[in-house]
UniProtKB/Swiss-Prot annotation:
Residues 17-54 form a propeptide. It comes from Lycosa singoriensis. This is U13-lycotoxin-Ls1e. The presence of a 'disulfide through disulfide kOR' structurally defines this protein as a knottin. GO terms for molecular function: toxin activity.
């Protein structure tokens, strides 16, 4: 049984190599036309568009003050005073401060946490 399996494997390998050589020689002799993809233009790489500057900064992005951050409860957290500032999560009080002082990116409503409310 093993000998039969080895013999079939060898015959199959010889067949694969011989058919590959036929295709290569026919292609070199221009007997076969190269396959053209009719949808190649559809998948062509498009030129990247320049990113426009956003009016607000997402979480983890650079900021100058709380009004630069997008989320209602986001605050501008700075290391070493005013250096390495980025938007991080704040709280309800942050939202109220932003509502009072920010003219752009002003929160419409401030979400309240349901953790402290007693249900009953």
């Amino acid at each position: 049984m093993k000998i039969l399996f080895v013999l079939i494997s060898i015959l199959y390998a010889v067949y694969c190599f011989s058919s590959e050589e036929d295709v290569d020689s026919a292609y070199l002799a221009n007997e076969l036309e190269p396959v053209e993809d009719i949808n190649s233009e559809q998948y062509a790489a498009l030129e990247p568009k320049e990113e426009q500057e956003r009016s607000c900064a997402g979480m983890g992005r650079d900021c100058k003050d709380d009004c630069d951050c997008c989320l209602n409860i986001a605050t501008c957290n700075c290391w070493f005073g005013r250096y390495f500032c980025s938007c991080t999560f704040g709280d309800y009080q942050t939202c109220l401060r932003k509502k009072g002082k920010c003219k752009r990116n002003r929160p419409q409503s401030c979400p309240r946490s349901n953790l402290n409310r007693k249900k009953g």
